[in-house]
């Protein structure tokens, strides 16, 4: 029997890439707020995350088997300017989804972040003490705790992903590829490190964890710690573009930005040990990203 997966934040980058990744093996519904989307083989439905009762009714009537909570307020600068809004969206609404799933006994995949630490140490595991440095990180850390309190069997995923973006929301890799193809120079940070994973790879790994009935917190990231600058260099290499257009820059020199952790890299070994496989390096993910463009996936998402 095909599982029915309901994805909140259905117009977002992660939701769109996730839906395409699993649509051949799952019945997928994208939960939408304002932005309308249309993807072949994927259902859509308007949803109100403000109401637990509404969520219970929607999940129940649609026959949902798994809920992926991918909605969120992710603009770090905007979160700092509007902390109440960030708190409401990232914490309260996430808790509403958790309560609804708990009431119905549904598996919940809650998408968290890697912006949870001070950024002074590399490759942190799930047991390290959280020390977020900005409003966005603080709201995501709080959400993790409330979600697990409301629905202890939830699967909380700390991650940092890349994939193809839409016409209304470019991804980081879109920005790099677009700039290089236009012959424009761009500056990327050499002092910011992370462990990015392709959204498609993330989706596959998470659903395998669901099959294993895993719960609790997991770092679902790539296996390679890399700077934003070197990520751009690797994109240029894989896509056959001019890496000379990428210039090194330092986040530490950009004093006007909201504070961010310099090192967001996470260890994925807990997940890898349970899955019985590694999750690949940056080049693996970028080669697949390139293949996705060739088979039309970038265009399918990009025209939305």
Model-derived segments and their meaning:
Residues 205, 212-256, 297-304:
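Mid/C-terminal beta-alpha module of Rossmann-like enzyme folds, strongest
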């Amino acid at each position: 029997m095909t599982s029915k997966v309901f994805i909140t934040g259905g117009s977002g980058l992660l939701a769109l890439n996730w839906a395409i990744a699993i649509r051949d093996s799952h019945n997928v519904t994208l939960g939408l707020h304002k932005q309308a989307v249309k993807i072949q083989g994927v259902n859509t439905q308007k949803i109100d995350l403000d109401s637990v009762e509404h969520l219970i009714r929607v999940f129940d009537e649609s026959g949902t088997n798994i809920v992926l909570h991918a909605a969120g307020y992710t603009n770090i600068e905007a979160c700092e300017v509007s902390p109440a809004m960030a708190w409401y969206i990232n914490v309260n609404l996430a808790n509403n989804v958790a309560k609804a799933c708990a009431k119905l006994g549904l598996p919940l995949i809650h998408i968290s972040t890697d912006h949870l630490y001070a950024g002074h140490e590399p490759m942190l595991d799930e047991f390290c003490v959280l020390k977020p440095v900005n409003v966005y990180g603080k709201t995501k850390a709080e959400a993790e705790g409330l979600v697990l309190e409301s629905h202890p069997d939830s699967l909380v995923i700390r991650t940092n992903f890349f994939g193809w973006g839409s016409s209304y929301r470019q991804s980081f890799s879109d920005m790099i590829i677009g700039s290089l193809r236009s012959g424009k120079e761009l500056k990327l940070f050499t002092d910011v490190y992370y462990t990015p994973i392709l959204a498609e790879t993330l989706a596959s790994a998470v659903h395998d964890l669901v099959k294993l009935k895993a719960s609790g917190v997991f770092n679902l990231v790539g296996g390679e710690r890399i700077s934003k600058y070197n990520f751009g260099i690797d994109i240029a290499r894989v896509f056959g573009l001019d890496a000379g257009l990428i210039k090194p820059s330092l986040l530490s020199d950009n004093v006007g930005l909201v504070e961010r952790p310099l090192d967001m890299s996470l260890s994925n070994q807990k997940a890898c040990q349970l899955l019985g496989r590694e999750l690949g390096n940056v080049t693996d993910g970028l080669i697949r990203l390139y293949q996705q463009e060739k088979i039309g996936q970038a265009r399918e998402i990009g025209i939305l």
